[in-house]
UniProtKB/Swiss-Prot annotation:
Residues 61-71, 79-91 have a biased composition (Polar residues). Keywords: Coiled coil. Residues 164-686 form a coiled coil. This is Golgin subfamily A member 6-like protein 6. Residues 39-60, 94-108 have a biased composition (Basic and acidic residues). It comes from Homo sapiens. Residues 15-29 have a biased composition (Basic residues).
């Protein structure tokens, strides 16, 4: 007779049942077959426990977390068989609880997978954003480098333009000095011309006075000549009368007296003729002097015209220089506006870079937070694994006492877990080696980059030294050129001083000539006085010879008539000379007016030159201010370059960090892909297990039906035995 266990036996206190395991929805109970109150629970629980043990034996190494969870569920499912409601002799949970536990485990795994996939997507999005930010930052850095190069080239061009402006200013200054010297020469020549004009005016006045005196003398001579002619006629008449009236003695006496008078008259006429000849010579000399003065005046007029042309050319050159300076100022203003716009663009780009840096910092903080969360999740997983291992150890100790089969299965599981751990350790060691190799490579790359940076810095220092040397050479060449210009200017000054000395010597020579002429005039006056004395003596002698020269009177009268004609001609010539003198005076006045106009023009030019000097001084001040601005801009550019270098270093550090993060993310993605593959394999296995469980349940139902049939038969047999 079979003995069935009693339903009122207590369960084991150390083996609690799992309260959270739900029933499987795909395994409905059979509604038509009635279950035995004592046999159905035992058979079902024992068969389900054996099927789950077989499943854990088949797939224990797919996922360690799944395996631990399955072992935990197994440990929790094991029972002493003391619970009358759930167990009969095997001590297993109900299939509904196991199905609930498996569903909860699958849902938890799916949630973890979804969370990990979500984190992976977030990390990939952040990685793409970081890559885009890096690309834009690199593009901005390249643009800034190109703009910095453009600014440096423009600075060099501005420096060259400033040098050209300095050269132009120096040329203008030299031209101004030349113009000043030329103006000084013109003033000196003007003074010399004014002196000559003053002297010419004085000589003209003297000549006019002398001409007036000569005209008065000529009038006196003509009057005397007419009186002498009248006297001669009267004397002739008297002689004729005397010849008729007086005797011979009286006639001889009167003839002697008349001869003396004729001799005196002839002497006077000869003296007058000689004086006229002297005055004619003096007039000829004066005419020659006037012609020479006219030639000199023409030469001076030509020189003045040439000077006026030169002054016009200088004015045109000055106007061209002013136009060039205006154009250069406009170019400088345009360049300053461009520099201001570029500075504004640089400020805007710096603000954009700062914003990008802030975005990068925020993204880095987010990535750090994600990494911290990942580390926390890893720590939680490790803690859960440790707890699961501890629970496994405790449950394994309890199960060793209960079932030998479970020990064998657990030993197999442990061996498999040890293999997995060894594989994981090997993988970790390989990963550590790979990380160490990558770190070594990164350190080598960093060292190479540092060496490259050092070499680039050395090359830049050498380039700066070369540039400084070139600037020194250029400055030395400029100094040499300036010294050569100074030497040339000194030579020109010396030449001008020599010219001035020569002009002074010429002036001294002219003054000496004038003095000699004055001495000649004085000697001539003395000669005139001596001639007068001689004339008086001659007159006395001529009075004695008058009687002898009666015959010569007629000849002298003829000569006198000729001399009168000559005197008339001389008077006509004098009139012509006076007209010429008037014309020369008019020309001199016109020249004086022209000289005054030239002086006014020279004054205007001097005023213009002063204005140009003021403009050049203002331009020099502006150039100094511009040079100060350029120095400030260079300092700003250097500061910007330093900030750019710092930003580049920061960007490189960020790139390194991002690369490390990308490597970590790739590793995590690989791990996640492996986990996903494992999860897909686990899901496939779970689906296969569910199919097997359904098949086993169908088998169990068939077995239960057979058991029910056997029970019915046994009951019939028992009834028969009781009846017997």
């Amino acid at each position: 007779m079979l003995m069935w266990p009693q339903p009122h036996l207590p369960t084991h206190p150390h083996l609690p049942t799992h309260p959270h395991l739900p029933t499987h929805p795909h395994l409905p109970t059979h509604p038509h077959l009635p279950t035995h109150p004592m046999m159905s629970k035992e058979t079902r629980q024992s068969k389900l426990a054996e099927a789950k043990e077989q499943l854990t034996d088949h797939h224990p190494q797919t996922n360690p977390s799944v395996g631990t969870a399955a072992s935990d569920t197994k440990k929790k499912k094991i029972n002493n068989g003391t619970n009358p409601e759930t167990t009969t002799s095997g001590g297993c949970h109900s299939p509904e609880d196991e199905q609930k536990a498996s569903h909860q485990h699958q849902e938890a795994l799916r949630r973890e997978l979804e969370a990990q996939v979500h984190t992976i997507r977030i990390l990939t999005c952040q990685k793409t954003e970081l890559q885009m930010a890096l690309y834009y930052s690199q593009h901005a850095v390249k643009q800034l480098e190109g703009e910095a190069r453009d600014l440096i080239s423009r600075l060099h061009d501005s420096w060259k333009f400033a040098g050209e402006l300095e050269q132009a200013l120096s040329a203008v200054a030299t031209q101004k000095k030349k113009a000043d010297r030329y103006i000084e020469e013109l003033t000196k020549e003007r003074d010399a011309l004014s002196l000559e004009l003053y002297r010419n005016t004085i000589t003209d006045e003297e000549l006019k006075e002398k001409n007036a005196e000569l005209q008065e003398k000529l009038q006196l001579v003509e009057s005397e000549k007419s009186e002498i002619q009248l006297n001669v006629k009267e004397l002739k008449r008297k002689l004729e009368r005397a010849k008729l009236l007086l005797p011979q003695q009286q006639l001889q006496a009167e003839a002697d007296h008349l001869g003396k008078e004729l001799q005196s008259v002839s002497a006077k006429l000869q003296a007058q003729v000689e004086e006229n000849e002297l005055w004619n010579r003096l007039n000829q000399q004066q005419e020659e002097k006037m012609w020479r003065q006219e030639e000199k005046i023409q030469e001076w007029e030509e020189k003045i015209q040439e000077q006026e042309e030169k002054i016009r050319e200088q004015e045109e050159k000055i106007r061209e220089q002013e136009e060039k300076m205006r154009r250069q100022e406009e170019m400088m203003w345009e360049k300053e506006e461009k520099m201001r716009r570029q500075e504004e663009m640089m400020w805007e780009k710096e603000e954009k870079m700062r914003r990008q840096e802030e975005m990068m910092w925020e993204k880095e903080e987010k990535i750090r937070e994600l990494e911290e969360k990942m580390h926390e999740q890893e720590k939680i997983r490790e803690q859960e694994e440790k707890r699961q291992e501890e629970e496994k150890i405790r449950e394994q100790e309890k199960r060793q006492e209960q079932e030998a089969k479970m020990w064998r299965q657990e030993e197999k599981i442990r061996e498999q877990e040890e293999k997995i751990r060894e594989q994981e350790k090997k993988m970790w060691r390989q990963e550590e080696k790979i990380h160490e190799q990558e770190k070594i490579r990164e350190e080598e790359k960093r060292q190479e980059q540092e060496e490259m940076w050092r070499q680039e810095e050395k090359i830049r220092e050498q380039e700066e030294i070369w540039r400084q040397k070139e600037k020194m050479h250029e400055q030395e060449e400029k100094i040499r050129k300036q010294e050569e210009k100074v030497w040339r200017q000194e030579e020109k000054i010396r030449e001008q001083e020599e010219k001035i000395r020569e002009q002074e010597e010429k002036m001294w020579r002219q003054e000496e000539k004038i003095r000699e002429q004055e001495e000649m005039w004085r000697e001539e006056e003395k000669m005139h006085e001596q001639e007068k004395i001689w004339e008086e003596e001659k007159r006395q002698e001529q009075e004695d010879k008058m009687w002898r020269q009666e015959e010569k009177i007629r000849e002298q009268e003829e000569k006198v008539w000729r001399q009168e004609e000559k005197i008339r001609e001389q008077e006509e010539k004098r009139q012509e000379q006076e007209e010429k003198m008037w014309k020369q005076e008019e020309k001199i006045r016109e020249q004086e007016e022209k000289i005054r106009e030239q002086e006014e023009k020279i004054r205007e030019q001097e005023e213009k030159i002063r204005e140009q000097e003021e403009m050049t001084q203002e331009q020099e001040e502006k150039m100094g201010e511009q040079e100060e601005k350029m120095c400030e801009q260079e300092e700003k550019m250097q500061e910007q370059e330093e900030t750019m270098w710092r930003q580049e270093e920061k960007i490189r550090e960020q790139e390194k960090k991002i690369r490390e993060q990308e490597e970590k993310i790739r590793e995590q993605e690989e791990m996640m892909q492996e986990q996903e593959e494992k999860m897909w394999e686990q899901e496939e296995k779970m689906c296969e297990q569910e199919e097997k469980m359904q098949e086993q349940e169908e088998k169990m139902r068939r077995q239960e039906e057979k058991m029910w049939e056997q029970e019915v038969r046994l009951r019939q047999q028992e009834e028969k035995m009781q009846e017997h």
